[in-house]
Amino acid sequence: MTEVRAVVHLKVRPGDLDRVIDAARTFVRQAAESEPDVLNLAYYVDPDGETIVVHEHYRSAAAMLAHLGAVDPDAAAMLGAHTSVESVEVFGEVTDELRSALAAWGEVAYFRPAVSLR
């Protein structure tokens, strides 16, 4: 099994950055408290507060799938109401089940491992 990473670019609706950050805090707290196979979940904001880049790092494709199934529905609804997905990139060995789950995000670019330090 290989680790899986994802990079998601979200466009923040004008004036909604604080709500998006609140949702992000919920996701990060939940992962820290109850999802040991989520290795990292980080949100980065551009200087204008218009774009958020999410870096996700999972122990495996199964861990990413489990995270998607465990997401707080209220926080997910808040994020969906105040952002739009600009792009999604997934890195690592992914399963058909994970691909199916990610299909709801729109077009997803997948990259398989080629060369790595680890």
Regions found by a protein language model. Give the residues of each.
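Short S/T/G/P-rich N-terminal loop/turn motif that feeds into the first structured element of a domain
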Residues: 1-52, 59-70, 81-118
